[in-house]
Amino acid sequence: MRLYRDRAVVLRQHKLGEADRIVTLLTRDHGLVRAVAKGVRRTRSKFGARLEPFAHIDVQLHPGRNLDIVTQVQAIDAFAADIVSDYGRYTTACAMLETAERLAGEERAPMPDLHRLTVAALRAIADGRRARELVLDSYLLRAMAIAGWAPALTECARCAAPGPHRAFHVAAGGSVCVHCRPSGSSTPPQAVLELMSALHDGDWEYAESSTPPHRSQASGLIAAHLQWHLERQLRTLPLVERGYRVDRTVAEQRAALVRQDMAHGNHTGQEDLPATASGA
């Protein structure tokens, strides 16, 4: 089979044998691809840091029966240096990469919009111009929209009656009207749903004027909606440092374990791990 080239974001990697690694890539034209990078763990490897998580690369691959083989790599954007130097940026970007892998679906199913969104979001985290918790929540909402799982925010999730509606129910699909509202629905302030809409639509002026309590509530609803559809917890999302105080000692210890998993491959591949997109 012929070699092929593609642009990709490195989602994660893990060890294979004494000198190789298996890398998981979100490519622009071929979707999720897993490939072997031979000799990459040697100190003189020609690939080196180009295949570290968070890297945006131009990669050439040789198709294989089970795993492709990386033959050439060129760096496009080196986001890792700015991301890994800061705990908050690092945990936020980890949550993005895990989400991207979960939403990408089957291997080799093209997801060009998800690829573009992920690159834009990593760029926004690396440059630090916007609040990282807002960038993350915007990314999660838009990524869910690409996958067809976006919560209903301006109409009833069940009957499509135009809103705004006060109630929100994750299993129902988002905001719900008084006639369709299931028991157990939450009733967040209207400003919370408006913030979620702003994050989805890229209205950064509104999003950045929001209050910490509203951001916290919106984050909770977004995370709950995502994980309900994924039918599993994201292992990186609880590590994300947001605007409220965290226990840095415990959180950084937990983040170190995730860093080891992603960078050094202490788990197998079967385990856990646009106009508006440009400003994600």
From Swiss-Prot:
Listed GO biological process terms: DNA recombination; double-strand break repair
* Top-level taxon of the source organism: Bacteria
Q: Which SUPFAM superfamilies match?
A: ArfGap/RecO-like zinc finger, Nucleic acid-binding proteins
Spans annotated as Disordered: 261-280
List the InterPro entries hit by this protein, alphabetically: ARFGAP/RecO, DNA_rep/recomb_RecO_N, NA-bd_OB-fold, RecO, RecO_C
Q: Which GO terms describe its cellular component?
A: bacterial nucleoid
Which UniProt keywords are listed?
DNA damage, DNA recombination, DNA repair
Name of a matching Pfam family? RecO_C
Q: What does this protein do?
A: Involved in DNA repair and RecF pathway recombination.
Please name the NCBIfam families in this protein's record: reco (TIGR00613)
Family per record: Belongs to the RecO family.
Protein name listed in UniProt:
DNA repair protein RecO
Provide the species name: Mycolicibacterium smegmatis (strain ATCC 700084 / mc(2)155) (Mycobacterium smegmatis)
Q: What is the lineage of its organism?
A: Bacteria, Bacillati, Actinomycetota, Actinomycetes, Mycobacteriales
